[in-house]
Amino acid sequence: MSLIGLDLFDFVKGIVLLALTSGATYAIGKQFFSSNYCAIARIIQALLLFASSFLFDSAGALILGVIVLIIGVGNYLAETNSKFAFLDPNLA
């Protein structure tokens, strides 16, 4: 038992929740936000991971949600503002 309660099973639950939310959020993002759907989809996915981490008691999903949120916000900033293009390797 670790100090923060993150073990292998908990991290696997987070990866499964990441995989389950991935396809749905990209479909929603592509349907409603055609210009920068990838960044919006990652932000929606991060919010779903935050909610599901508390619902399924998964610290792994919470950690992955923070990582996905940081990537999503970085992509959104890179796509909407040319000063932040260095955040996305495809735009730099």
From Swiss-Prot:
Intracellular or extracellular location(s): Host membrane
Keyword Membrane belongs to the record: yes
GO cellular component: host cell membrane; membrane
TM helices/strands, residue ranges: 11-28, 32-52, 54-74
Keyword Repeat belongs to the record: no
Membrane topology designation: Multi-pass membrane protein
Disulfide topology: none
Keywords: Host membrane, Membrane, Transmembrane, Transmembrane helix
Name used for this protein in its record: Putative transmembrane protein ORF92
Native species: Acidianus bottle-shaped virus (isolate Italy/Pozzuoli)
Lineage summary: Viruses, Viruses incertae sedis, Ampullaviridae, Bottigliavirus, Bottigliavirus ABV
